[in-house]
Amino acid sequence: FSFSVVDVHNQRFGPYTTWPRDAIQAGLSQPHLGAQISFTGSLIENLNALAAGGVNGGMWNNWDAGYDQGGSWTTTLGNPRLDLVAFGYHHPLMPLLDEQDIRMQIRLHKHIYAQTWTGGPTYSRGIFPAETAFSERIIPALVAEGIDWVLVDNIHFDRACLNYPHTNQSGLFAPNAADQINPDPAANGGAWVQLNNLWAPSQVSAPFGYQPHYVQYVNPVTGAITQMIAVPAARYEGNEDGRGGYGAFLYDVVMDQYIQYNTDAAHPMFVVLHHDGDNYGGGTD
């Protein structure tokens, strides 16, 4: 059995270099179009090493230029169209780490980011925690490192509501009733929606499960409260989009099933399609 670490990277030359920039460039006529992309620090380190070593005739030289360019483009509101969000250096599951370790993972990531994109945008204020692994226990560490928002699987928004229609088919145990402190969305103008035309074994709440919310950690010793914004990552839609994108995910058909609940202009629904590049074999040349 032969295996080449270098070849694994070479097979992903497109997504590691220009594909994200190219996708955003195709939509520059749209006022708000953009994307958030995450690199582990160790992957950045690998790509820098490939460039420094002149691998394959220097094919990795300036691999970071596309991200630099994409980060220089702004939306009509002045936000970067390509946001390289914060991440742990070694792809850590942050809820399993202590506060010092979490902060060091982010600091190391900031360090290699600054080394790689010397003239690029300032470090992102948002984070995609590896594997979307989140716990309120990590909030103080994130906030201490200047992180304002975090992507959270939106099934956890739903599970924290009264009358959540749990099913074992979701792959999760029933929620702790003590955690269900939010009102039933269906009793407040929303609904529990059973999505069709994609794998979605549990109902989703609309609009609640698709709206950013403040989340907080209360220090059990001091009572000090630390808050940040949780951005809902659309669990089932992101999974389907990552599986195959156009053709696999029927965007309009699925989103039309809850768009009628997008009635609060001050707190609009926010459908984030989050996924890992290599899942289901995608993301390679």
Each language-model region and where it sits:
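Acidic, His- and aromatic-enriched active-site or binding-groove loops in soluble protein domains
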Residues: 55-83, 111, 119, 143-215
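Catalytic grooves of carbohydrate-active enzymes
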Residues: 196-285
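Glycine-rich, histidine-containing beta strand-loop boundary motifs that form or position
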Residues: 37-41, 86-88, 128-131, 145-146, ...
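N-terminal regions that are enriched for targeting/export leaders
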Residues: 1-50, 57-58, 62-70
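Generic structural signal for well-ordered alpha-helices
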Residues: 20-24, 106-113, 139, 255
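Metal-dependent polysaccharide deacetylase catalytic core of the NodB/CE4 family, i.e.
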Residues: 41-130, 224-244, 268, 272, ...
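A short acidic (Asp/Glu
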Residues: 46-52, 96-98, 132-143, 155-156, ...
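The substrate-binding groove and active-site-proximal loops of carbohydrate-active enzymes
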Residues: 2-15, 49, 88-103, 122-131, ...
